[in-house]
Swiss-Prot record:
Its EC number is 3.1.1.11. The record marks Q198 as: Transition state stabilizer. The gene is PME68. Keywords: Aspartyl esterase, Cell wall, Cell wall biogenesis/degradation, Glycoprotein, Hydrolase, Secreted, Signal. This is Probable pectinesterase 68. It is found in: Secreted, Cell wall. Disulfide bonds: none annotated. Pathway: Glycan metabolism; pectin degradation; 2-dehydro-3-deoxy-D-gluconate from pectin: step 1/5. It comes from Arabidopsis thaliana. GO terms for cellular component: extracellular region. Substrate binds at T141, Q176, R276. InterPro entries: Pectin_lyas_fold, Pectin_lyase_fold/virulence, Pectinesterase_Asp_AS, Pectinesterase_cat.
Amino acid sequence: MAQLTNSLNYLFSVSLLLFVSFHCLCFRFSLVAACSNSTDDQQIQHHHHRKWVGPSGHKVITVSLNGHAQFRSVQDAVDSIPKNNNKSITIKIAPGFYREKVVVPATKPYITFKGAGRDVTAIEWHDRASDLGANGQQLRTYQTASVTVYANYFTARNISFTNTAPAPLPGMQGWQAVAFRISGDKAFFSGCGFYGAQDTLCDDAGRHYFKECYIEGSIDFIFGNGRSMYKDCELHSIASRFGSIAAHGRTCPEEKTGFAFVGCRVTGTGPLYVGRAMGQYSRIVYAYTYFDALVAHGGWDDWDHKSNKSKTAFFGVYNCYGPGAAATRGVSWARALDYESAHPFIAKSFVNGRHWIAPRDA
């Protein structure tokens, strides 16, 4: 009996020791996890203050139609770059008109298209939204782009992108024809041309900076939900009856997206709306911009005239000039901004540019 009692006491002691050890171990893991979460929170809070490392190394790939280069096709040059690329790759494109559709996938960041000048180097195609794709279905707008970029840190310099589909008349269906679609983050464009009619430039998503570019079209020829600055660009309308420059797709007030046109020139034919509320909380600002006498009465359009977007959209102008400038303030819900309210849209901080745009490029 005594031996049984001793055995039971021993088993109880061992069980108690295991119980206490288990709970101590659980407490330790909980403490480590809590500390880890705290550290993660601090890392998240300081994420935007960390120095960007960028790509490692640089490589140049050449393209020429005459065969005196590594590739004859821009797409072939893109395809030669490995997935998950971590080098800065410049694709140097010789003068010529490259008739092809080009896609830069999300797995290939840090690519630059460098042309010999926007008047002599161009990539062009002719798809429309109503055209049929390989699956027998209509392409729809976003798939018509002559060039589509999904990758981050894309750059284009001194090159043009064109959709050669003919311009539609107002009200014609299925004639959307995109020249360029940018869906990647932190993209930079300098000295580029974008040529089309309806929906020329699909500024789809991400932060983008366009400097000294020429953008031509007729209806909503800059559209999407990007967070983009257009600095010292020419926005040229080829509208035959009426047209519109920008249609922004911001859908909720928490989004930081918007189009900021700073120091631009608006030229061409009209009458022309300077902005349309594609999204319920569309956001478009013009500052220090010249307007030809082509702005439509009212200046702005709320898209469908039944969603009360005029109450939620943010359309603003600051220090604009030219014979058409007064018309940009033609509706009560277009805001005449003062410097304080305009400043967030006229500095490159609007696109967090200090972290990824070189000072010489700003």
